[in-house]
Each structure stands twice: as structure tokens, then as C-alpha cells.
Amino acid sequence: DVYKRQASELMVALQCGGSDALSGVTANPALGYACDLLVAQGGTGVLAETPEIYGAEHLLIRRAIDDATGKRLIGLIDWWQDYTARNHGSMDNNPSPGNKKGGLTTILEKSLGAASKGGTTPLTGVFKYAEPVTARGFTFMDSPGYDPASVTGQIASGCNLVTFTTGRGSAFGSKPSPCIKIATNTEMYERLMSDMDINAGAMLTEGQSLEEKGREIYDMLLTVASGNPSKSEA
């Protein structure tokens, strides 16, 4: 039997790992465009990894639907700053060695790319780790920057699909929510084609537009939600 469901029932985790210099140029903005399309249909996007929006949090705070929502996000950043200071660390200890090999230079550069996964719509809610996401639209969930831990929280919060952009490459997959992998560059996509669902590098190598790639990602969300397996599931 076939059961029809609305796109508004989708809650999508917006995740990245193994970022490179093209993450903020191709895959992440394209995912942000797809998130906007999803939100327009009544669906929900859930951004996470609080330490990895450090330095770009103002771009999200000014999109908050009200002062209370913006202040909740500020509170999360303040907590992580205090936590790292108490443990003799700092919030600017990113990017990782792999990020640097991929061309990222500072946490600010990395954060600008990470934040772009959230598109352009208002920030409707800010939630604790694994707290049920009760708002519709673009939301944020507190989590560490470690991908498996972050995605686990997003799934526990209610995400029934996971989108995962990567530039350096990643073998990450998830259950019970399917994971759609998006490559930032064509070289890596061709090398890991058996594990990548979408090549956002085609925006550079084939001249595809942001809108075209964003629509492709959105269509893939619907395809996988309809039962077709992603590469991580195959």
C-alpha cells in the first residue's frame, strides 16, 4: 500500500563533517536553499554543533523570531565559552588538521560556512541537546561539534532525515533516520561515489546554479523519504 504524506512532516538534520574550503561555497549554501524550500512547505530544518557556529552566531541571532529565541542561542554560546575556559581550552581551537588541509584557515571561516546550511528563513526555535523540537521552520539544537554525537541528538529530537555535507570525505551514516551525503567538490565525489548521494562540486565544474543544486537536494529529500535508499543505506 502507498501512503501519501506531506513534506511538512519532514524534520531534517542539517549536518556537516570533514569540511573544506568549498563547504561554504557549494554544498552548505545549496543545502541552505533546500532548507528554505522545505520550510516553505511547512517542514523543519534542525541546525546543530554549537561550537561550530562560533563567530557567526550573530547571523542566526538576528533571524530569531523574538528576543527570547535569540537570547537562548546567545546563552548556548556563553555556556560553551565558559565550558572550554574551565577546561583550559578555547573556542577558536578549530579548524581541525583535516579542515586546514582542505583549505580552511580559521574557526570564523568554518563557522560562516556551517551557518549557511540553515538557509535564510527566520529562526523559530532553539532547543537543548536531544530535546524534542516542537517548532516548525528553521531551528537550532545545542550539541558538540563531534558529528556522531550531534546527529544522535538531532535524531533524538525528532529528525527523520539527515543531510550531511563533506569536503574531505566521510563514511558517516545513521539509523534509524536515513543520511543523505553531499560532496562539496567533484574530485572527492568521484573518489567516494559509492558513499556520496549528491555532487555539489558540479556548481563549479559544470556551472550548475545554487538554485539548481538546492532543488536537487530538496528532491532527494523527498525521494529518500519516499523509501528509496540513500548510499549510506545501500
Predicted regions and their residues:
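Short, small-residue-biased leader/transition segments that mark boundaries at the very start
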Residues: 2-3
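Anaerobic metallocofactor- and corrinoid-dependent redox/one-carbon enzyme cores
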Residues: 9, 14, 20-234
